[in-house]
């Protein structure tokens, strides 16, 4: 009995210990299994990706393009513009900051793994084949490297690569300035392969002609232009090394006229109006009218020089040049008009003065003759007149004295009236009407012509 009881006791204790251990293991051991499995899975993925990357570059030659000898490599491109501007008129160039995306397929980089898309470090871009894209009209291009190279590289399991770079490009923008400052321009951005002709590499737009070039809503950095929109297309050029495809994106710009109205147009208009004030001054006011004429001519000269400083030295006249030239003609004509009036005014003074001098001499002789006769008659009458005849009836009496006084008064009045030799010039009268009408008509025709017509954008090509 004792042995049986001892055996049962031992078995019971053993069973109890087993149950307790199972309970503890279920509480602690099973709770640690998920973490351990996640870590193991992560480690396995890292190991798998490492093996994939190591295997991708085994026997890979980045000197050879994908599909060499079998097919043409197609490179799909699109552009996202983060900042557009500024635009330099004098240099005929513009600056643009973009995310430049390129996508192509390289069957040598196909892989099988737990993920369909594999994000890669930008260092791998130097170890694989990438398109030799360059910008045809680029003057200066910068690839951003702060804080690390701004590049993105993604690889899909079928070998499709997405390569994105952030670039700042200064590109040429040919401008036709005949309509300046009411002009519009299409600034192109042209890029393509440097070495591969169409028989080896072709470029296409990723999202067609409408969405392949997108400008951010707050991406415009323009003070003198409105960014009206953008269009894309393709061009083909033939050289001695083959035929190449050029991808083109045109950014359509319309100039803002407000700055030039304040800076040039209003001062020119006010100067012309000021020059016409001289028509209302007396033609005898030679200093005042001379100051008006010379000052306005010098002002127009200064305005014409300053207006040209913001433009390149083109060989043709712009719309602003025509306006300034006409205003200059009006101002100079006002000065010539004054010179003409002044010339005839001097001649009028000379002839009127000569006639007045001759008339004064004749009147003086007549007056002396009359006075002599009156004095002699008065003296004779005083000595010999009959006593019954009043003095008023005698020749040379008081009546004659009154007549002589009236003659003198009329002569003085005549001489006073002769002092004003010149009336208002007929040329001035005509100029007061003709000059404002002509200048107003010119402004009406000028602004109606340039503001109401559609802007002519030269250099833009229709999308293909």
Curated annotation (Swiss-Prot):
Any one biological process term the GO annotation gives: inner ear receptor cell development
GO cellular component, one term: postsynapse
Disordered: annotated segments: 382-414
InterPro entries associated with the record: GABAA/Glycine_rcpt, GABAAa_rcpt, GABBAa5_rcpt, Gabra-1-6_TM, Neur_chan_lig-bd, Neur_chan_lig-bd_sf, Neur_channel, Neuro-gated_channel_TM_sf
Keywords: Cell membrane, Chloride, Chloride channel, Disulfide bond, Glycoprotein, Ion channel, Ion transport, Isopeptide bond, Ligand-gated ion channel, Membrane, Postsynaptic cell membrane, Receptor, Signal, Synapse, Transmembrane, Transmembrane helix, Transport, Ubl conjugation
Keyword Cell membrane found: yes
Signal peptide residue numbers: 1-25
Record location of the Glycyl lysine isopeptide (Lys-Gly) (interchain with G-Cter in ubiquitin) cross-link: 355
Molecular functions per Gene Ontology: chloride channel activity; GABA receptor binding; GABA-A receptor activity; GABA-gated chloride ion channel activity; ligand-gated monoatomic ion channel activity involved in regulation of presynaptic membrane potential; transmitter-gated monoatomic ion channel activity involved in regulation of postsynaptic membrane potential
Protein family membership: Belongs to the ligand-gated ion channel (TC 1.A.9) family. Gamma-aminobutyric acid receptor (TC 1.A.9.5) subfamily. GABRA5 sub-subfamily.
PANTHER family linked to this entry: NEUROTRANSMITTER GATED ION CHANNEL (PTHR18945)
Assembly behavior: Heteropentamer, formed by a combination of alpha (GABRA1-6), beta (GABRB1-3), gamma (GABRG1-3), delta (GABRD), epsilon (GABRE), rho (GABRR1-3), pi (GABRP) and theta (GABRQ) chains, each subunit exhibiting distinct physiological and pharmacological properties.
Protein name in the entry: Gamma-aminobutyric acid receptor subunit alpha-5
Source species: Rattus norvegicus (Rat)
């Amino acid at each position: 009995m004792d042995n049986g009881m001892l055996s049962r006791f031992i078995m019971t204790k053993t069973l109890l210990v087993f149950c307790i251990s199972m309970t503890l293991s279920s509480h602690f051991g099973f709770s640690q299994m998920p973490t351990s499995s996640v870590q193991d899975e992560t480690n396995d993925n890292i190991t798998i990706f490492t093996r994939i990357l190591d295997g991708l570059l085994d026997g890979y030659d980045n000197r050879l393009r994908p599909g060499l000898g079998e097919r043409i490599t197609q490179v799909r491109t699109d552009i996202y513009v983060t900042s557009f501007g500024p635009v330099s008129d004098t240099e005929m160039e513009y600056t643009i900051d973009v995310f430049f995306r390129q996508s192509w397929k390289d069957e040598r980089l196909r892989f099988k793994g737990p993920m369909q898309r594999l994000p890669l470090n930008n260092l791998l871009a130097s170890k694989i084949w990438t398109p030799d894209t360059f910008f045809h009209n680029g003057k200066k291009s910068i690839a951003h490297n702060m804080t690390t190279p701004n590049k993105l590289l993604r690889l899909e399991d079928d070998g499709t690569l997405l390569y994105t770079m952030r670039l700042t490009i200064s590109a040429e923008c040919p401008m036709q300035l005949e309509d300046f400052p009411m002009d519009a321009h299409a600034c192109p951005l042209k890029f393509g392969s440097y070495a591969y002709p169409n028989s080896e590499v072709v470029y296409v737009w990723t999202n067609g002609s409408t969405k392949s070039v997108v400008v951010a809503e707050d991406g415009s950095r323009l003070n003198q232009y409105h960014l009206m929109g953008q269009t894309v297309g393709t061009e083909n050029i033939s050289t001695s090394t083959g035929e190449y495809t050029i991808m083109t994106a045109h950014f359509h710009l319309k100039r803002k006229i407000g700055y030039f109205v304040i800076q040039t147009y209003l001062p020119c208009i006010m100067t012309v109006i000021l020059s016409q004030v001289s028509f209302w001054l007396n033609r005898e006011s030679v200093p005042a009218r001379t100051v008006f004429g010379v000052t306005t001519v010098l002002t127009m000269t200064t305005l014409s020089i300053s207006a040209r400083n913001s433009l390149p030295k083109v060989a043709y006249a712009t719309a602003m040049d025509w306006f300034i030239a006409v205003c200059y003609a009006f101002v100079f004509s006002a000065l010539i008009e004054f010179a003409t009036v002044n010339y005839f005014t001097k001649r009028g003074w000379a002839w009127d003065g000569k006639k007045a001098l001759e008339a004064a001499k004749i009147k003086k002789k007549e007056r002396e003759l009359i006075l002599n006769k009156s004095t002699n008659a008065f003296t004779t009458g005083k000595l010999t007149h009959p006593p019954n005849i009043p003095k008023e009836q005698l020749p040379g009496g008081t009546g004659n004295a009154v007549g002589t006084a009236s003659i003198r008064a009329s002569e003085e009045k005549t001489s006073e009236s002769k002092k004003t030799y010149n009336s208002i010039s007929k040329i001035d009268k005509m100029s007061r009407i003709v000059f404002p009408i002509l200048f107003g008509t010119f402004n009406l025709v000028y602004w109606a012509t340039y503001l109401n017509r559609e802007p002519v954008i030269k250099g833009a090509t229709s999308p293909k």
